[in-house]
Amino acid sequence: MKHISIADAEHYTWPSAIGSILCDGWHLHRSGALSVIEERMPPGTAEQRHLHSHTTQFFYVLAGELTIEVDGEEHRLSLSTGLTVSAQTPHQVFNRGSEDARFLVISQPPSHGDRIPANQVAPGA
């Protein structure tokens, strides 16, 4: 069994939907059935609104705070709180706080390759 941290995990960046700031992600665990990623979003950043056809995700805040819009309803998460987003549910994550938000995204099955921009989905679909 191997220990892992963000120091030795596979790292990637992704652009915020707001401005030109980059956010970070680290693959802590990746298998055919499960993905665990730690992400960092600087203040004032957001991801693109999207959904997953088959993937259920659980977001868990490690530092800072997140706002997650799920199917039109906003949920504010602070330290040590989490939220499940079911498959086929449009959602968007924002950092509206004043410090970096660090959080885990646990996806089952892994979400890579299963991401549909919400603007490509018919309302009520």
How does the language model describe each region?
Residues 37-52:
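Conserved short histidine dyad/triad with adjacent acidic residue
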